[in-house]
Amino acid sequence: LGDFRLNHPLDQSYRLIFQHILYNMVEKEITTANVGTVVLEEKDYQLAEITVKGERPQVKLEGGKLTYDVPQLMKDKTATNAFEIIKDLPGLIERNDNLELVGASRLNIILNGQLTTMSADQLIQLLKTMPASRVEKAEVMYNAPAKYNVKGALLNVVLSKNESEIPSWQGETGVDYTQYRHAGGDAHVNLLYTNKGFSIDFLLNGNKRRDVMGEDMLARHTLNSGMTEISQHNRALVHVNRGTVRLGMDYTFANEDKLSLAYYLKGDKVLSDRDAFTSYLDLSKPENKSESTSLVRDDGHSAIHNIRLQYDGHAGISAGADFTRYHSPSVLDYQDTNTNGSRTDMINNTRQDVSRWSVFLNKTHSFASGWGLNYGVHGGYASSKNYSEYLYEQGAGYEMDEEALEDNTQKEYIADIFAEVSKNFGERFSATVGLKGEYFKSDYASSRENMNLWNEGALFPTVSLSYTFSPRHILQFDISSDKTYPGYWQVSPQVTPLNSYSEVAGNPLLKPYRTYEGQMVYIFRQKYMLVAFCEYTPDYFAQLLYQSDTELKTVFRFENMDYSLEAGLAVIIPFNVGRFWNSRITLRGWRMQEKNDNFHGISYNREAYLGLAHMSNTFNLCDKPNLKMTIDGQYVTPGAIQGIYDLGSMYEISAGLKWTFLNDRASLTLKGDDIFASSIPRTIKINQGNQWSRMRKLNDERCLKLSFVWKFGGYKEREHDSIDTSRFGK
């Protein structure tokens, strides 16, 4: 209803009373200068047996963006962090900690509209450390404006701002207990200081957990006109310790220009102990049977440092610079003993060091005629140094295998220039057309060879059209394209053994892939959505398993395909049953096709028809005490494919109970995720040409979580940034 300020010294506690003819009265006891956001509940009016109820729109179209009022949508949810809030937005689907937007190939995420070099994965990890109370609004774009320096779909998470004319300290702290197969925990502290145009925020988060991983495999490997049956049992225990620190400062000048400086540090230590039991049976000579036992310990850690400076001017100018440093050494101790008398004792030392710079300059013009112009430039440089050595026990100590030594450097240069024009044609029709030109060069150098991986330019046109039949009926159409490059380790020719039969290998011949996609979105009554989508990706790559034709090994490696093609429809249906039950149903059906004419001696052209059903439910059990319950479910039909993989069905059921108390300053939440341990395919099958195997995955995603959160000083969080590490690591 508005922003209010009382110019009165706060020398004692006060009681504020909020009253409006259309809303229920709210009383609030305050002891701090910044009250934060106060949400009023709408009244129901009964007039002569006629009940008139007000309903807020689920979604609005603002400048080509689908805008969601997050506090209103999520006020009764049991979410305890920002990620849990975001993943429940209409049209978003969460799978194994990854967010998908219905009808989009990939979803980029930014905070408060600021340019960022962080990947979606890294930003998701950061959102998990933020309180849910921080999220104020979410903006979804199927076709991101060029000024954001991302291509394709974009989710802009707008976080609440705490501006105060007098010095103010606020904060939140919380602890989580998590029970997977083993117990774990998480703790966080967020502090914010504001004074007129200056603010400083601090985030500290730490977590510790142990994960159980494993696979059971049955394979029939054809080699030299013979067939060997391999039966394998893998189990691993992974210890993870992780910490995050973020310090940010913002200053707003009198003319509304804003200067932002942020430092981000994330460090983790991962210790994995894996054992595997493998049996080999020659089907033509059953007497030729052998068994091996593999013990693998992988001890590694990583650290990411990021510093970012950005200036946003009131005249439409944005400029900034970003630097990221990544360091990740690891030691792998591999021992394998076979009943045929062979034994392998090997140590694999690896190290990756990445330095990346990025600068940008954007300018926006808004003309009185209704036209808008946005243009800018972006430049970047990255250097990745990858090192891998193998030492084998030969009876007199460990000796290095000089031929297997890999020491390479990959340097990248990138330059972008873009222009974008927008126009509102009356009150109904609006259009945005943009073009980005990109030059990308990557050089690879090692002790064996020097080569140019990629040296190419590309154009990325974008079109966004929207037509408003009425404020409650909107049609939107988007066309965009994107390009995805492999990770640094993925093109490095190193090999990492998993056990006596399986290994992970790099692919120096891996190529980037281009994506072309389009969406048509119809919004009915500002809450129901119908989405039609199509996506074509030539040279698409994914990690696939194949059985070697030169040795008895199965290899996990990223491989290019000829193309991937998907097209389908989705519908989103929200509904309420009084104040007690709030629900949303998402239904999606699509056709997928993947083709490859040369995959290790075989070819495939595969298609599948799939369906997805997702339902989220919130129940308002009672107001005093304030108890809310959520039950969410998702089901994916069997038949999904990835290359030569056949994936089984997946479903997930989660439930939670949240108690809010101490005048909404504290909450206690009990939640069960993936209750039936069924969120990943139970079985992955391969039966293409001479490739045959069955793999059953062990699921350790089932979790019981108990969370306590306490806010002090009227805390409402500020924005945090992170870094793109999607191409770092193995």
Model-derived features: positions:
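Short, surface-exposed beta-strand/beta-hairpin micro-motifs centered on an aromatic residue
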Residues: 2-8, 125
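A short, solvent-exposed loop/turn motif at the edges and junctions
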Residues: 13-29
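Membrane-proximal, glycine/serine-rich, low-complexity loop/turn segments characteristic
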Residues: 44, 49, 55-279, 294-327, ...
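Outer-membrane beta-barrel translocator domains and adjoining extracellular loop/strand segments
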Residues: 152, 213-227, 272-289, 329-340, ...
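Surface-exposed extracellular loop regions of Gram-negative outer-membrane beta-barrel proteins
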Residues: 152-153, 159-175, 243-247, 268, ...
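Outer membrane beta-barrel strand-and-loop segments of large Gram-negative receptors
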Residues: 356-358, 511, 517, 530-589, ...
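C-terminal beta-barrel architecture of Gram-negative outer-membrane proteins
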Residues: 613-661, 666, 673-685, 689-692
